Amino acid sequence: MSKKGRSKGEKPEMEMDPVQMANEELRAKLTSIQIEFQQEKSKVGKLRERLQEAKLEREQEQRRHTAYISELRAKLHEEKTKELQALREVLIRQHEQEAARTAKIKEGELQRLQATLNVLRDGAADKVKTALLADARDEARRAFDGERLRLQQEILELKAARKQAEEALSNCMQADKTKAADLRAAYQAHQDEVHRIKRECERDIRRLMDEIKGKDRVILALEKELGVQTGQTQKLLLQKEALDEQLVQVREAERYHGSPKRELPPGIGDMAELMGVQDQHMDERDVRRFQLKIAELNSVIRKLEDRNTLLADERNELLKRSRETEVQLKPLVEKNKRMNKKNEDLLQSIQRMEEKIKNLTRENVEMKEKLSAQASLKRHTSLNDLSLTRDEQEIEFLRLQVLEQQHVIDDLSLERERLLRSRRHRGKGLKPPKKHVVETFFGFDEESVDSETLSETSCNTDRTDRAPATPEEDLDDTTTREEADLRFCQLTREYQALQRAYALLQEQVGGTLDAEREARTREQLQADLLRCQAKIEDLEKLLVEKGQDSKWVEEKQLLIRTNQDLLEKIYRLEMEENQLKNEMQDAKDQNELLEFRVLELEVRDSICCKLSNGADILFEPKLKFM
C-alpha cells in the first residue's frame, strides 16, 4: 500500500516538471528575443549614424569645392586686373609720346611761319607766295601721308588688341564651362553615392524587417504554447477541485467512523478498527499529497496571474502607442505633401534661373556681334568726315548700350521683386497658424522626432514594459503620471506661448530685412545708373576734345566693364542656383527621413496589432476561469 501511495504522489510531480521546464524555456526564449531586438535597434542606430556621417562628408566636400572655386575666381580677377593695369600703362606711354611728337611738329610749323613772315616783311611777295604754296602742298601731302600711316598702324594695333580681348574672353568662358562641367560631375557623383547609401539602407531595413517578422512569428508560436499551458492549468485546477471534494468526503467518513454513539458487534468491531487504522494512514498520505499538489498549483496560478497582468499592461500600452502613432502619422503625411510641393517650386525656380543665364549669355553674344559689326563699318576718305561719323556712331552705340543695360537692370529688379513676393507668399502659406505639441510615442515634439530621442524612448519603454508591477507601485505610478500630466500641460502652454512670440518676432525681422534689401538694391541700381550716365558724359567730352585718340581706349574699358558686370551676374546666379540646390537636397533628405519614420510606424502598428490579437487569445481562458 505504501508503494502504491508513493507512486501516486510521484506522478503529479513528474507531470509538473515538464510544465516548469517549458515555462523556463519560454522565458529564456523571450529574453533572448528581447536581447536580439535590442541589438537590432542598436544596428538601426548605427545605420542612422552612418547616414549622418555621409551627409557631413558630402557637406564638407561641397564646402571645399566652393572654396576652391572662389579662390580660382579671385586669381582670375587678379590676373585680369594686372593685365588691364599693364595695358593702361602702355597706352599712357603711347599717348605721352604722341603728345610730344605733336608738340614738336607744332613748334616746327611756328618756326617756319615765323620765317615766312620775316620773308614777307622783306618784300618778296610773289616768290614767297609760290614758295609758301609749294611748301604748303608738300607739308599737306606729308602730313596726309603721315596721318594715314599712323591711322593704319593704330587700326592694326586695335585689331590685335581686340583679338587678344576676344581670346581672353573665350578662354574665360571655356574655363567657366569646364568648371561648371566639373561641378556637375561632382554633383552627379555625390547624388550617385547618396542613392547607393540609400539603397543599402533600404536593403538593411528590409532585412531587419524580415528578421522582426520572423521573431514576431516565433513570439506568436510561444504565445500559442502559453495558451496551451493555460489550458493545462485549467485542467489542473479542475483536478484540484475534485481532490478538494474527495478530501471533504474523506473527512466526513472519518467523523462518521470515529463517532462513539455507533455500536457494532465484537467481531465486526475488530475488523472495523483494523480497516479504520489502515484507512486513516491512507487518508493522511492522501491529504499530504493533495496539500503539496494544491500548493504547487497555487504557485503556478500566481505565476500565471502575474504573467496575465503583465500581458494586459503590455496590451494597453501597445494600444496607446498605436493610437499615438495614428495621431502622429497625420502631420507627417501633411508635412510630406508640403515638402513635395516645395521641391516642385524649387525645381521651377532653378529652371527659371537657368533660362536667365541663357538669356545673359545670348545678350553677351549679341553685344560681341554688335561690336564686330561696328568695327567692320566702312571708312570714309576724308579725315574730317571720318572723325565726325565715327564720333556720332560711337555716341549712338554707347547710348544704345546704356539703354540695353538699363533694360537688363529693370528686368532683373522686377524678377527679384517677383521672387521675393513669391517666397513671402510661400512662407505664409507653409507657416502653420499654431504648432500643436503632440505627446507622441517618442516623446514631446511639434511635428518631427529625432532619431536619438526615438531610440532612447523606445529603450526606456521596453525597460518599463519588462518590469512587473505591484498594486502599491501602480498607485505610485498613477500619482506620478498625474503629476507628469500636469507638468506636461503647463510646459505645453509655455511652449506654445514662446512659439507664438517667436513667430511674431520672426515675421517682424523678416519683413524689415526684406525692405532693407529692396532699398539697398534700389540705391545700388540708382548709383550704377548715375555712374554710367556720368561716364557717358565724360566719354562724350573726351570724344569732342581729343577726337579719335581715346575712342578705342574708352571702347575697350567699356567692353571690360560690361564683361565684368556680366561675370558678376553669372556668379550671383550660380550662387543662387547652388543655394536652391542645397535647399532641394535638404528637402529630399528630410523627405527620406520622414519615409523611414513612416515605415517604422507601420511596422510598430503591425506589431501592436499582432500582440493585441495574441493577448486577446491569452486572456480568454482566464476570463472563463474568473
UniProtKB/Swiss-Prot annotation:
Residues 452-480 are annotated as: Disordered. It is a peripheral membrane protein. It is found in: Cytoplasm, Cytoskeleton; Membrane. Keywords: Coiled coil, Cytoplasm, Cytoskeleton, Membrane, Microtubule, Phosphoprotein, Protein transport, Transport. It comes from Bos taurus (Bovine). One of its GO terms (biological process) is protein transport. Associates with microtubules and may play a role in the microtubule-dependent transport of the GABA-B receptor. May play a role in JAK1 signaling and regulate microtubule cytoskeleton rearrangements. The gene is JAKMIP1. Residues 365-626 are annotated as: Mediates interaction with TYK2 and GABBR1. The keyword Cytoplasm applies. Belongs to the JAKMIP family. The modification Phosphoserine is found at residue 382. The modification Phosphothreonine is found at residue 470. GO terms for cellular component: cytoplasm; membrane; microtubule. Homodimer. Forms a complex with GABBR1 and KIF5B/kinesin-1. Interacts with JAK1 and TYK2. Residues 1-365 are annotated as: Mediates association with microtubules. Pfam families: JAKMIP_CC3. It comes from the Eukaryota. GO terms for molecular function: GABA receptor binding; kinase binding; microtubule binding. Phosphorylated. Residues 19-254, 284-413, 490-604 form a coiled coil. This is Janus kinase and microtubule-interacting protein 1. Residues 452-461 have a biased composition (Polar residues).
